[in-house]
Each structure stands twice: as structure tokens, then as C-alpha cells.
Amino acid sequence: RYARVTGVQTCALPILLTEIAREIRVGIIDAVHSAKSGHPGGSLSIADVLTYLYFEEMNIDPKNPKKPDRDRLVLSKGHCAPGLYSALAHRGYFPVEDLKTFRHTDSYLQGHPDMKHTPGVEMTSGSLGQGASTSCGMALANKIDKTSVRIYTILGDGETEEGQVWEAAMFAAHYHLSNLCWLIDFNGLQIDGPIAEVMNPTPYDTKFAAFGWNVIECSAHDFDSIEAAYKAARECTDKPSVIISHSIKGKGVSFMENNVAWHGAAPNDEQYEIAMHDLGER
């Protein structure tokens, strides 16, 4: 529905991106409500980041989704597929109305991303930690081939409790994968509660710095902050970058914000109407 927004006057860019992000959030709620299942909380918390990546940052073409020089996004926190699908739909990879087939039998929009069935999905994901490793492999291959391709990865903060993430972090620094940029969706909540209580993976800044990464922080719901973070990542040419993205789980829907109950639950009809009102659709 939207083309890439590059070329929009700088003063108008955050306004346009904010509207796109709002529509992406509407798509997320439509998807999980239709399926009566799914993961809205963490999908809503990355909606602004997904908006910036797909509509401003990444070199992609929905009309030619397999072009060799395209940038790649790996959604390592694959349970947040509703966010990815809504971003892809609004970017033009498939019809927005198909979001309401999410998790339905025979739909190409299943509960976790599948690179063999869904246009625009670069890596099948859902087993937490694996996207961290596969994105490293993508980055190394493109470094060997001397391409201009950049690899973007989104991980959950709870996901960083997986040991595989830290093995991948060591690998990326060892091979100086400056074409790799991870973003950690730091909303502080996972399915069992606050990450600090379940298995505290912080502090991220000193840990990643010790591993040899370029560490950046941003506000996940401020497009100026997101833009500055990805610009800083691009300017780093000798090591991988990680963005610690401070977010609000369930952002945009009043009763879902900072509420762990909405990690993996769908709104009923009454709650759906409240969510649509919160998102400006009523």
C-alpha cells in the first residue's frame, strides 16, 4: 500500500512513518483477533522499528522480492510474526486483507515466519536464538562475496537468555561483520514475567561491548531516535552493531501496554473494539 518513503522532506518523515506504524498496528490486531491466537504484545512493541526498516532503511523491492542485492531482515523472535506480516503487507508484498487469514488452515501466513511460503520472509524462525546464528551466516556470506547487502535482525530480550545468541555474538565479532545489525527489543517482559526475574540477561551495553560489538541505544517509539541508531550502525565499518531498543510491550493498545498477559493472547470482540478505538479506527 505504501512505497518507500525516501525523498520525503525531513520534517514530514516522522509524521508519515507514524501513520504507517499505526496502520501496521491495526493489521497486527486484525490478524490475532481473526485467528483467536497469536502474540500481539511483542509485535506491537516492534511496529515502529519495522516501519522504519521497511519504509526507509532497507534496500528492498516488493515487486522483485528476490533481487540479489536486497537487504535482509531476520525476525529471530519469530512468534511476533503478526508484526512482520503486517509490515510486509503494507509495504506491498501481499494484500493487507490477507492478514485476517493469519493462522488459518491453508493460509500462507502461519504462526511463525516461513521463508518457503510467505513473500518477503527471508528466514524461517521461531526457535529462539536461531535467527541470531542464521543472520551471522548471511552476513559472512555477503562479506565474502563483497556485496553491499546489509543484514538486519530483530531479537527479543527474553530470547537473549538463549546461549545460542551469545555464541552468535562471539562469531559476528570474530569475523568483523560490519554488515550485520542486530536490534534487541528491550520491553522487559517475556511469557513468564519480567526478564529481570526470569533470567536476567542485562546489562546489554557492557556485555556486547565486551564481545566486541558497536553498541547503540534508541527509543523504540521515536523515529528520530530510530533513524539516528541505524545511521550510527551504518557508519561503523569494523565490527557488528547492536541496537538496544527500549520499547513498551503492547505499545498503542491501552490495555496491552506493559501487560505480560498479552504476550501470547488474542483480544475478544469487546477488547478488539477497544483496541481499534485506541488505534484511531473507531
What residue spans do the PLM features occupy?
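Single conserved hydrophobic/aromatic residue that forms the stacking wall/gate
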Residues: 1-11
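N-terminal hydrophobic or amphipathic helices/low-complexity stretches enriched
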Residues: 12-24
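Glycine/aspartate-rich loop-and-adjacent alpha/beta segment that forms the canonical ThDP
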Residues: 223-282
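N-terminal capping segment at the start of a domain
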Residues: 21-37, 185-187
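Thiamine diphosphate
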Residues: 120, 124-235
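Glycine-rich beta-alpha junction loops
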Residues: 79-80, 84, 187-188, 222, ...
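Cofactor-binding active-site loop characterized by glycine-rich and histidine/acidic residues
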Residues: 28-31, 43-174
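Generic beta-sheet signal
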Residues: 71-73, 149-153, 180, 239-247
